[in-house]
Design a protein with these regions (language model features):
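Charged docking surfaces used in two-component/phosphorelay signaling
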Residues: 39-47
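Active-site beta3 strand of CheY-like receiver
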Residues: 68-74
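Receiver (REC) domain active-site loop signature in two-component systems and cognate sites
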Residues: 79, 102
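Short hydrophobic/Thr-rich beta-strand motif most characteristic of the beta2 strand and flanking loop
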Residues: 49-56, 64
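C-terminal output helix
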Residues: 130-140
Length: 147
């Protein structure tokens, strides 16, 4: 004879606010040549309520920026074709894109890198490896200022 055991599992219930979001928190263009990092950033920002587009490098970013019209660009420093520094310079030189907030994502946030970014007009830095929540908060603040 087989005996069945009954058991109960209790788990806390977490209520989420599922109200329809009529307008995104802002538009973000995520620029990174590493597909995994690019998608990680994009998905986290989408879950937070941002409208997200992606680009594979600086050249792709410059080609997409007029169409996407982002409030914030997350920009990796080390990329092929056109790196993050040159991309940021070109964004700042163009009157049509100079207002866009730029977050540099870099493994190299040494003092001279930060100084260079400040000279270019970079708005914020996030150092790799990064906490997605830190990046989200940074983007939230910049998007709020941008709108």
């Amino acid at each position: 004879m087989t005996r069945a055991r009954a058991f109960a599992v209790r788990s806390p219930c977490v209520w989420a606010n599922f109200e329809a979001v009529t307008e995104p928190l802002g538009r973000v263009l995520v620029v990174d040549d590493d597909e995994v990092i690019r998608q990680l950033i994009a998905v986290n920002l989408q879950l937070e309520g941002f409208e997200v587009a992606t680009a594979v490098d600086g050249q792709d970013c410059l080609e997409k920026v007029a169409e996407v019209r982002p409030d914030v660009i997350t920009l990796d420093v080390m990329m092929p074709r056109l790196d993050g520094w040159v991309t940021a310079i070109r964004l700042r030189e163009d009157p049509g894109t100079a207002h866009i907030r730029v977050v540099m994502i870099t493994a190299r946030a040494q003092e001279h890198d930060v100084r260079r970014g400040n000279e270019i007009g970079v708005d914020a830095y996030v150092t790799k490896p990064f906490d997605p929540n830190q990046l989200i908060q940074t983007v939230r603040k910049l998007a709020a200022v941008s709108r």
